[in-house]
UniProtKB/Swiss-Prot annotation:
Enzymatic reactions: D-lyxose = D-xylulose
Biotech applications: High substrate specificity, thermostability and solvent tolerance make this lyxose isomerase enzyme a good candidate for potential industrial applications.
Function noted in UniProt: Sugar isomerase that catalyzes the reversible isomerization of D-lyxose to D-xylulose. Is highly specific for the substrate D-lyxose, showing less than 2% activity towards mannose and other substrates reported for lyxose isomerases.
Top-rank taxon: Archaea
Subunit structure: Homodimer; disulfide-linked. Stabilized by a disulfide bond between the two monomers of the dimeric enzyme and increased hydrophobicity at the dimer interface.
Protein name, UniProt field: D-lyxose ketol-isomerase
Amino-acid positions noted as binding Mn(2+) in the UniProt annotation, renumbered to this chain: H75, H77, E88, H143
Cofactor descriptive note: Shows highest activity with Mn(2+). The Mn(2+) ions can be effectively replaced by Co(2+) ions. Shows less activity with other divalent metal ions such as Fe(2+), Ca(2+) and Mg(2+).
Binding site for D-fructose: K62, K86, E156, D166, R175
Family: Belongs to the D-lyxose ketol-isomerase family.
Dependence of activity on temperature: Optimum temperature is higher than 95 degrees Celsius. Retains 60% of its activity after 60 minutes incubation at 80 degrees Celsius.
Enzyme class: isomerase
Known cofactor(s): Mn(2+)
Length: 180
């Protein structure tokens, strides 16, 4: 559960990171930055700061701001009716991000997962993204990612985003945050 104070703190930190990366955003966009702890109550371990520029039935563009070593838990974007599920391209803008997808598990991956949560991380093929590098994730594909030691900023370009329908491996995850 997030407090209003923690959301404000995280939003301000995300804004500073965007400024450091020379990514200009408007005052209105600063207020729209979403902060989620995925309902796990440990924002700086499991969390994400998200600025949605546009999201409609045809396409979506976002900035994903990640604090040092922050993790977005394993999930997939399933088909919904005639919609195939979200296809997304992650492009690293700043920092370093470790993305995990199905494939041959990477020996000695860079990610660090709390021991009590490891059972909820099942794909271990590592893709390291540095500024200027990108990777496209097909619809309905399990994936998760973690920022490097300095954090990361990732631009996401995708088909329509319906975050509330994402399916997480960890049954304790709540994608839409509860703020008190």
């Amino acid at each position: 559960m997030l407090t209003k104070e923690l959301v404000k703190e995280a939003r301000e930190k995300a804004i500073r990171m965007l400024e450091k990366a020379c990514i200009a955003i408007t005052d209105e966009e600063k207020e729209k930055i979403e902060v989620t702890d995925f309902g796990l109550g440990v924002l700086y371990t499991f969390g994400l700061e998200i600025l949605v520029y546009v999201n409609n039935e045809r396409y979506c563009a976002k900035e994903l701001v990640m604090f040092p070593r922050q993790i977005c838990p394993e999930h997939r974007h399933p088909p919904i009716g005639s919609y195939l599920g979200k296809q997304e391209t992650f492009r690293c803008r700043w920092g370093e991000v470790y993305l995990y997808v199905p494939g041959t598990p990477t020996p000695n991956p860079r990610a660090r997962i709390p021991e009590e949560k490891k059972r909820y991380f099942t794909v271990w093929h590592e893709i390291v993204l540095r500024p200027g590098e990108q990777y496209t994730i097909p619809p309905n594909t399990l994936h998760w990612f973690q920022a490097g030691d300095e954090g990361a900023i990732v631009s996401e370009f995708s088909s329509q985003s319906i975050d509330e329908k994402d399916i997480f491996t960890d049954p304790n995850v709540k994608r839409i945050p509860e703020i008190v």
